[in-house]
Amino acid sequence: MSAEMTDLNFAEGRPLLVDKDGITVLLQEYVTQEHDIETAHGIVHVTMCGTPKLNRPVILTYHDIGLNHKTCFNSLFNFEDMHEITQHFSVCHVDAPGQQEGAASFPAGYMYPSMDQLAEMLPGVIQQLGLKSVLGLGIGAGAYILTRFALNHPSMVEGLVLININPCAEGWMDWAATKISGWTHALPDMVISHLFSKDEVHSNHELVETYRQHIVQDINQNNLQLFVKSYNSRRDLEIERPFPGSNTVTLKCPALLVVGDSSPAVDAVVDCNSKLDPTKTTLLKMSDCGGFPQVVQPAKLAEAFKYFVQGMGYMPAASMTRLMRSRTGSAASSSSQDGNRSRSHTNEGSRSRSHTGDGNRSRAHTGDGNRSRSHTDSNNTNSEHNTPKSMEISC
């Protein structure tokens, strides 16, 4: 990791000038407003950046445990490639109760909201801010909260970008971590093990220590312990991959699942991908990246975000990204040797029901008569063979 990571700047980004093709363009300054919004389950702190655009959703972010919206997302939103997106969309950052900068400790006996209740705070936030719909961007615990929100209120969510999503209830290791985290000195280590893989802890000392210091010094430890306990007490999302004629619980909106190839959440994300509608879901696995793609690989994440938004029908005039060019080229030459280096680089065939084991996993399958779903034996009625395969991208 470069030395810059030791001095991460968590200040709010307000881009004014950008150089595009040698021409300096003045951008509209962000109007940033902070609000403490009272909901049925308590007060939540939000930061609005920009003015909501007509007929466009607002990007709503939700951070992971041990973080707040600044330490979680500012590295991404301050990145130059994101400026084109934030010119088209305003952003609403949500801080989980008591996790914002300078938050006071909750009184003794305070019952911290459950993960379901944290999700149910969001409709009140959206209504009080006068928003119509959102495009969710969540990481870890925040990804879970946004997914629960989208399942309960599908009309409010146009799309989701979910990083390190774990759709399952806690396992026994999580249960043990919850008990141990009751010891104040053990809490930062438990959070670090959630955010970073073992390889990152050993090889990326500067980044890990930067966030360890932030967790210890800048986040209210009592409040953090309550948030961690709430996350480790989460219920299973109980989502299932839909098939024709079924009435399963699943996301109705497009979803982009993102995970680093060495992230501690990689297995959970692949599992989540296998449970979602493959016609609306894309799995992006980032190489040379662990649990913090928004910090370590902001260019790739911004690129993927832009492509996702374009796929939803927004920003049609935006420049084509490398990911889009890669996918377009792959689709145009699906019968060529390029299939071997397409979005199937994840090598997760043994871990995801959506994988066929072939190099070519494109939903088109136009060049493979032997593998095409239209050419399967009439005796094969298994729904798994008739279900479209989810798209995967590796970068």
Curated annotation (Swiss-Prot):
Assigned keywords, A-Z: Developmental protein, Repeat
Low complexity bias locations: 326-339
Protein's UniProt name: Protein NDRG1
Gene from which this protein is expressed: ndrg1
Gene3D superfamilies to which the protein is assigned, alphabetical: alpha/beta hydrolase
Stretches for region 4 X 10 AA tandem repeats of G-[NS]-R-S-R-[AS]-H-T-[DGN]-[DES]: 339-378
Chain segments carrying region Disordered: 325-395
GO biological process: pronephros development
The keyword Repeat belongs to this UniProt entry's keyword annotation: yes
Biological role stated in the UniProt entry: May be involved in pronephros development, after specification of the pronephros.
